Amino acid sequence: MATINQLVRKSRSSKVVKSNVPALEACPQKRGVCTRVYTTTPKKPNSALRKVCRVRLTNGFEVSSYIGGEGHNLQEHSVILIRGGRVKDLPGVRYHTVRGALDCSGVKDRKQGRSKYGVKKPKA
């Protein structure tokens, strides 16, 4: 425990909290342009072809973003919106593509959990 005199000379330093999503710069989402759309394999023990795209953001950052849902219409030069949220089994992928915003379409024939995949309520 520090004495009062020690605290007067040098106050306590607060912990620096490091962001998990530095490219967003404290914004909820950021717009960017796809520079490459590709599939990659997850780390052990999972096995799949995960859809990922490399995105050049409006602030100059270049990041990898995961494309969730079944099927997508993204290609090079598509303008997309990204949000934070990492993919646990893909190293280096710390962002998600927002479905149903800008050039990224919603998931086709999606009935449940629609809001996460940019799908409007189907006509009854």
From Swiss-Prot:
GO CC, one annotated term: small ribosomal subunit
3-methylthioaspartic acid modifications at: D89
Keyword line: Methylation, Ribonucleoprotein, Ribosomal protein, RNA-binding, rRNA-binding, tRNA-binding
CDD domains given in the database record: Ribosomal_S12
Alphabetized Pfam families for the sequence: Ribosom_S12_S23 (PF00164)
UniProt-listed GO biological process terms: translation
NCBIfam families, sorted: rpsL_bact
UniProt family annotation: Belongs to the universal ribosomal protein uS12 family.
Protein name per UniProt: Small ribosomal subunit protein uS12
Species for this entry: Proteus mirabilis (strain HI4320)
